[in-house]
């Protein structure tokens, strides 16, 4: 009798663990980013958190507020992030086409090592400005939940749209271009 009760208890325990695993997987798959991303994608246009960070592509620092009057695409990435590698050429293309239209792409490397980030930049031929947020303070301010995440900011410093995950599929690229056009029109 005791072995039957033990089998039932083990079955219940396994069932609970499986249920928790399923709930965790569902939660991760349906995560659409932090509050800032959710507000932007609802159409609220929250003010983009300001930052002043060390540049990896050049000397000095980059202050987001110095870009006021331009549309800005801020892409959060890390050298160890596989989807970031797929997305890098897309962002470089957007930068090459958009800089004549008052569009600035800013790469924000976080939770990474500087030498690894610079190798990533060389490997993928990144020419847009890149800043370093080593421990992730700015990443936390934006509510970034994973890499990559991309925020489109209008000329007035408000977040027009946010993209959780790589922007490399056709649908995502169309949505991103639409958000950029919207940001440039303000």
Across the structure, where does each feature detected by a protein language model lie?
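Thiol-/selenol-based redox modules, centered on thioredoxin-like
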Residues: 152-186
């Amino acid at each position: 009798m005791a072995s039957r009760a033990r089998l039932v208890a083990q079955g219940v325990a396994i069932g609970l663990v499986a249920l928790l695993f399923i709930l965790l997987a569902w939660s991760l798959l349906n995560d659409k980013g932090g509050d800032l991303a959710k507000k932007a994608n609802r159409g609220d246009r929250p003010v983009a958190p300001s930052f002043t960070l060390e540049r990896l592509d050049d000397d000095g620092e980059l202050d987001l507020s110095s870009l006021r009057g331009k549309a800005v695409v801020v892409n959060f990435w890390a050298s160890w992030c596989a989807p970031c590698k797929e997305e890098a050429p897309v962002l470089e293309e957007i930068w090459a086409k958009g800089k004549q239209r008052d569009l600035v792409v800013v790469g924000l490397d976080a939770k990474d090592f500087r030498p690894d980030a610079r190798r990533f930049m060389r490997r993928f031929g990144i020419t847009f400005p890149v800043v370093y947020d080593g421990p992730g303070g700015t990443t936390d301010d934006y509510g970034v939940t994973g890499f990559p995440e991309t925020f489109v900011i209008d000329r007035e410093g408000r977040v027009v749209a946010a993209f959780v995950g790589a922007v490399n599929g056709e649908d995502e690229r169309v949505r991103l271009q639409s958000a950029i056009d919207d940001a440039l029109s303000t």
